[in-house]
UniProtKB/Swiss-Prot annotation:
Location of the region described as Disordered in the Swiss-Prot/TrEMBL record: 1-32
Protein name: Putative truncated effector protein hopW1-2
Source species: Pseudomonas syringae pv. maculicola
Signal peptide residues on this chain, from the entry's feature table: none
Source superkingdom: Bacteria
Claim: Chaperone is one of the keywords in the record: no
Length: 240
């Protein structure tokens, strides 16, 4: 599927990310997704689509991950502390210089924590006092995992699959923002440049899938959970 097709099909977002048309011009009423879309269109930079920045929290990701894992494994976790740690972890993961936490151990640890958290949430009644905090923990862990995957798939070693992060960025765009009248052509010029690069990288990805499928599979396998999570979310959005 081309980036243009993806933009057309992702026509709505979950209630928590949906703004009203009457408040579209009010920056205070914009959904997080709309804010990110505006930033992405204005800059034409991949990091803007995910809210990634070089000024993100400088906290040590690996240290936070270990602390969070120990707290989650307690027989009776302190859920407010757990939620705060997960929030700090997600913030730390948003930095665009995250190479130090891309080791296999960190990936497996985080994926294991997400599975544990999702399982625990599934067995927690919605009426339980800990439910909302646990749901928040799960969302922040998945957010950290997304940024972990983006950091790795945009690295030189993953050049053959560089089109994947571009596609993940494009499916998160808010079509209502894209449909607005251009406020300034320079913004759209930058975004158009990104689209051109994304089309080229997606074409290269398609070619690599045909001619180097085993290598591509090895590169993508560690990030299958991220890709499936994002794809599943978009399918839920469009009603499948």
């Amino acid at each position: 599927m081309s980036p243009a097709q993806i933009i057309r099909t992702s026509h709505s977002f979950p209630p928590s990310f949906t703004g009203t048309s009457s408040s579209a011009e009010n920056s205070h009423a914009q959904s997080p997704q709309q804010v990110l879309t505006r930033a992405f269109v204005a800059s034409g930079e991949l990091n803007a689509a995910f809210g990634r920045t070089s000024t993100a929290s400088a906290q040590d990701f690996t240290s936070l991950l270990g602390t969070l894992q120990r707290e989650l494994e307690k027989k009776t976790p302190a859920f407010p502390d757990l939620a705060e740690l997960a929030n700090q972890l997600a913030d730390a993961a948003m930095g665009d210089q995250g190479g130090h936490w891309l080791g296999r151990d960190e990936q497996q640890t985080l994926k294991g924590m997400i599975d544990r958290c999702k399982s625990q949430l599934a067995h927690t009644p919605a009426s339980d006092a800990s439910y909302d905090l646990l749901a928040q923990v799960c969302e922040n862990l998945k957010k950290a995992r997304l940024h972990q995957s983006i950091s790795q798939m945009t690295g030189e070693a993953h050049a053959k699959v560089r089109g994947v992060p571009d596609l993940l960025a494009l499916i998160q765009l808010d079509p209502d923002i894209l449909a607005e009248k251009p406020v300034g052509m320079p913004s759209y010029v930058k975004f158009s440049s990104f689209i051109c690069m994304a089309k080229a990288r997606t074409a290269e990805l398609s070619e690599n899938l045909r001619n180097a499928s085993n290598e591509v599979a090895l590169l993508l396998h560690p990030h299958a959970d991220t890709i499936l999570e994002q794809g599943s979310l978009r399918l839920q959005i469009v009603g499948f």
